[in-house]
Every structure is written in structure tokens, then in C-alpha cells.
Design a protein with these regions (language model features):
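Glycine- and acidic
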Residues: 24, 43-52, 79-83, 147-157
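Generic recognition of stable, solvent-exposed alpha-helical segments in well-folded globular domains
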Residues: 26, 37, 54-66, 90-93, ...
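A non-catalytic, helix-rich entry segment at domain boundaries
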Residues: 46-124, 197
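C-terminal, charged and often intrinsically disordered regions of DNA end-processing helicases
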Residues: 1-73
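Metal-dependent nuclease catalytic regions and adjoining charged, substrate-binding loops involved
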Residues: 171-216
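Non-catalytic protein-protein interaction segments used by genome-maintenance enzymes to assemble
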Residues: 119-176, 198-199
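Residues immediately flanking
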Residues: 38, 45, 65, 117-119, ...
Length: 216
């Protein structure tokens, strides 16, 4: 039947994915790609294609560096000068609205506890690289905020996949700081839309480990 054929194709794709050596070190933002479509991700690793830098990626790099500088971070991301020097006026003009949106956000007048804090979390044989854009104190704990210069989640499924990144960040900061997970909130700020997205629920440590083990 057609269903049997589709199931066979899926099993074949998963079998092929298992033959591809996947990286041991994984950016937290890629967790969702493993979970949502491992065969497609494995194919990209099997046949890597050179990618041109996208305007959105460049804008994201510039915006994150600007926020770092605004909060007085001593360490600015490497490579920002080279991006600016290629076409500084055009690059700066393209993020003016992002800056304006940030200045009107609730984050603008807060002092972060952490800015661009990198923490590594190990699950099984893999290490996830978690770079927390900012951490702010709350009344009874902290809130992790991830600045996004791209588009908001298009639906509930998309949001739940993106939220895996926040769940990893929360776990990472819990291990780093010693704070229990329930004292750590996490949210996205989609700067271009001036929109905050805070998932109602984030996976806990055991759930993340189980999900990863099921995926790999």
C-alpha cells in the first residue's frame, strides 16, 4: 500500500542518516533540526554545500554586537569590524529599526547579569554549545532572553521546536549557576517585529535527555 511504501521510505532515510557521522559538538539552535528532520540534516552533513552570507545573518551579527557594546560588554564578537568595513553605512542603516525597537523594549533599561555567556551542556556523547544572549534578574530568579532578528514562529509547532533552544539554555544556566530550573525563565525577543515570545512550558532535563536519545 501507499502507507507501507511511505513507511519503508522513512525507514530507509533514517537508516541512511545513521550512517552519516554527525558532529559531537552541536549549537543549541540546531537541536530542533535534529529532532524535526534528522535525515535531511544528515544529508546536509553528507553533502555540505557552500552558503553565501545572508543579509539576515549579517544583520543578526551586527545587532548582537551592538547590544553587547550598549551594555558595556568587554568582549565583542570577532569579525564585526570586517563586516562593517565591507559596507559600513549600508550595514548600519539596515539595523536602525532593530536598534529603535530594542530601545523601546522592556530590556532597554535593565542591567543584565550576563551578556553573551557561553555554556556547554553534555547529553550522552554530544556537547551542546549554548550562547546566552542575556540573563536578567527577576523577583525570584532569572530570565534568559534570546534576541532574534528573524521571523516569529509561524505556528504552535514551529514555536515548540524553537523552544527547544530555550530549554537547553535553561538547563545550561541551571548547571552553571546552581539555580533550580523552576527559578529560570526563558523567552525570545523578535526584534524586527518588536514581539516577545515566552513559551508556556519548557522541557526539563530528563525530557531533553529522553528526546535526544530517541532522536539519535
Amino acid at each position: 500500500t501507499d502507507i507501507d511504501l511511505l513507511l519503508a521510505e522513512r525507514d530507509e532515510a533514517l537508516a541512511q542518516a545513521n550512517l552519516v557521522p554527525l558532529p559531537v559538538r552541536v549549537p543549541a539552535s540546531k537541536f530542533k533540526d535534529f529532532v524535526s528532520d534528522l535525515p535531511a540534516l544528515a544529508e546536509r552533513y553528507r553533502r555540505p554545500m557552500p552558503q553565501k552570507p545572508y543579509k539576515q545573518t549579517r544583520n543578526g551579527t551586527l545587532f548582537h554586537a551592538w547590544v553587547e557594546a550598549r551594555f558595556g560588554a568587554a568582549h565583542l564578537t570577532d569579525g564585526i569590524d570586517s563586516v562593517d568595513n565591507q559596507n559600513e553605512s549600508l550595514a548600519q542603516e539596515s539595523i536602525q529599526q532593530l536598534k529603535a525597537n530594542f530601545e523601546s523594549s522592556r530590556w532597554a533599561n535593565l542591567e543584565p547579569l550576563e551578556i553573551e555567556r557561553e555554556i556547554q551542556v553534555t547529553i550522552g556523547a554530544n556537547t551542546f554549545i549554548c550562547k546566552l544572549d542575556a540573563v536578567f534578574a527577576t523577583a525570584d530568579g532569572v530570565e534568559i532572553v534570546d534576541w532574534k532578528t528573524g521571523k516569529k514562529p509561524k505556528d504552535a509547532e514551529d514555536e515548540s521546536l524553537k523552544a527547544l533552544q530555550l530549554a537547553l539554555y535553561r538547563l545550561a544556566y541551571s548547571r552553571f549557576s546552581g539555580l533550580p530550573l523552576e527559578k529560570i525563565e526563558a523567552s525570545f525577543y523578535f526584534v524586527a517585529d518588536d514581539s516577545e515570545v515566552k513559551p508556556e512550558r519548557l522541557l526539563g532535563e530528563a525530557e531533553l535527555i529522553a528526546l535526544w536519545n530517541e532522536t539519535i
